[in-house]
Amino acid sequence: MNVYAYQLDIVWEDKEANFKKVREWTSRTEPQSGSLLVLPELFATGFSMGAQSLQEPEDGLTESFLKELARDTACYVMGGLVVTRSREKPTNDALLINPEGNRVGHYSKMQPFNMGKEGENYEAGNDIQCFELSGGLRLCPFICYDLRFPELFRKAMMMGNPPHIFVVIASWPNMRTHHWTKLLEARAIENLTYVVG
């Protein structure tokens, strides 16, 4: 399986502008069908603390866009979005869509970046998720600050069917790129598995 990761220069809190950028990227890239397209954490809005005003229900605008993108490219698509759930605050989610445009599943970020007040605006998730793709490939998503918690990755590896690949979507700041690279490498080495980030 080919993986295409898009480092999007996000237009702040402008979903339509960001959808357009993603469309332009897939037009230029022409991904091979059956591949995995990976978009950043909160790709449609940026890492905004305006979660209450940006949240969407399941099957909202951003999920609909991801489903359409998956169908149009015949690829798996993973992207981050702000989702309304039956909780006090919305969640920061990674959503996985299959090439037919159907939801495979979602993961809610378990470790909010509280130094940036994320925990005040987003509800933390509480379950590690692992999804099976075509050919039996198992994928486990995490989001941004989760990367700093190796125990999450070990728990995923201890599940009945451990993942073959971790995908970490993020809005990681440039000033900590060195940390990002080293942490991705560490999670791969510790778990003897592939990591995309």
Describe the predicted segments one by one.
Residues 164-174, 197:
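His/Asp/Glu-enriched short active-site or ligand-binding loop at hydrolase and phosphoryl-transfer sites
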Residues 56, 85-160, 173-186, 190:
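Active-site catalytic loop in hydrolytic enzyme cores
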Residues 1-5:
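Extreme N-terminal starter segment of soluble prokaryotic enzymes
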